[in-house]
Swiss-Prot record:
Gene3D superfamilies: 3.30.160.20, 3.30.70.1660, 6.10.140.1950. SMART domains: PCRF. This is Peptide chain release factor 1. InterPro entries: PCRF, Pep_chain_release_fac_I, Pep_chain_release_fac_I_sf, Prokaryotic/Mito_RF, RF-1. The lineage of its organism: Bacteria, Thermotogati, Deinococcota, Deinococci, Thermales. It is found in: Cytoplasm. GO terms for cellular component: cytoplasm. Methylated by PrmC. Methylation increases the termination efficiency of RF1. HAMAP family: Rel_fac_1. Transmembrane segments: none annotated. Its main location: cytoplasm. The keyword Protein biosynthesis applies.
């Protein structure tokens, strides 16, 4: 393990040097990427330095065990240092877990209204706004790729891109069924209803990831539609792309340009096909007990937003907060950090089982 720690410290020193390099400072994109990596490494570097200090202190304590006058004190100190050493090793193991190479990619996020009619569409809008605020808080850029608004201002479906280093790794734990419990605006009796929305998060695929065979793709053009199915455009700018071998269908209508909608639709299709390929590989690995996925199945109910109790519960890890307003305002970091830690613990357990 010490060799890995040496390499991390060397990388950290190299990053420090690069961040003060005038050429790097001129390149905003590269500077931001290096700064993010430097900030990410801060915690593990602190742990490494503490670990090395514990090893030094442990060596010193053991050298005093033969001294009759200091033996008892050295013995007590040695026990405390051994306990701290073990705790630090567990923390470092977590940081040294292999990262998903897709984590640094941009993300495609799709939110679909589920059961609950118009209330589900309004909940989909709430989730969309929550993610936009969270993305802004994290320094990511967002762009709506496709949206289908409803009469009361909700969304039956909305797809958007999150751009920035680590976007997919940040958002991936949001995949699954989200449930809301509240009194809908359409409810006249004051009864609490339960509605759902499904979130899918995909790593953005690059052209080299998945070569699309255009002979296997059907592209239809149509007029964009608004709430209630009414036309909002007098030109055929909306695009529907169908991947014939899998039946995957993607529509895009947010741009007035048919060409831009076509490009966006193909990009989403490529990302879905890449995710399908990744899911098949993950299933194969899971069956052979070589890996586990901690991001939740899409059919699984992952989180409940209970308005009467101002409570948010993530069912995957039993995490509960009563700051519903804060969560919907985009303060997702405590939940996502807890999910990330639980995922790492599962990976460590899987490695321990061999």
């Amino acid at each position: 393990m010490l060799d890995k720690l040496d390499r991390l410290e060397e990388e950290y020193r190299e990053l420090e040097a690069l961040l003060s390099d005038p050429e790097v400072l001129k390149d905003k994109g590269r500077y931001q990427s290096l700064s993010r990596r430097y900030a990410e490494m801060g915690e593990v570097i602190g742990l490494i330095r503490e670990y090395r200090k514990v090893l030094e202190d442990l060596e010193q304590a053991e050298s005093l065990l033969d001294d009759p006058e200091l033996k008892e004190m050295a013995k007590a100190e040695r026990e405390a240092l051994l306990a701290r050493k073990e705790a630090l090793e567990k923390e470092l193991e977590r940081h040294l877990l292999p990262k998903d190479p897709m984590d640094e990619r941009d993300a495609i996020v799709e939110i679909r209204a589920g059961t609950g009619g118009e209330e589900a569409a309004l909940f989909a809008r709430d989730l969309f706004n929550m993610y936009l605020r969270f993305a802004e808080e994290m320094g990511f850029e967002t762009e709506v790729l496709d949206s289908h608004p409803t009469d009361l201002g909700g969304f039956s479906k909305v797809v958007f891109e999150v751009r920035g280093p680590g976007a997919y790794g940040t958002f991936k734990y949001e995949s699954g069924v989200h449930r809301v419990q509240r009194v809908p605006v359409t409810e006249t009796q004051g009864r609490i209803h339960t509605s759902t929305a499904t979130v899918a998060v995909l790593p953005k695929a690059e052209e080299e990831d998945f070569a699309l065979n255009m002979d296997e793709i059907r592209i239809d053009v149509m007029r964009a539609s608004g709430p209630g199915g009414q036309g909002v455009n007098t030109t055929d700018s909306a695009v529907r792309v169908v991947h014939l071998p899998t039946g995957i269908m993607v529509t895009c209508q947010d741009s007035r340009s048919q060409i831009k909608n076509r490009e966006k639709a193909l990009m989403i299709l490529r990302s879905r096909l890449l995710e399908m390929k990744r899911a098949e590989e993950a299933e194969r690995l899971r069956k052979t007990r070589l890996a586990q996925i901690g991001t939740g199945e899409r059919s699984e109910k992952i989180r409940t937003y209970n308005f009467p109790q101002s409570r948010v519960t993530d069912h995957r890890i039993g995490f509960t907060t009563h700051d519903l307003e804060g969560v919907l305002s985009g303060h997702l970091t405590p939940i996502l950090e807890a999910l990330k830690r639980a995922d790492q613990e599962r990976q460590l357990a899987a490695l321990a089982e061999g």
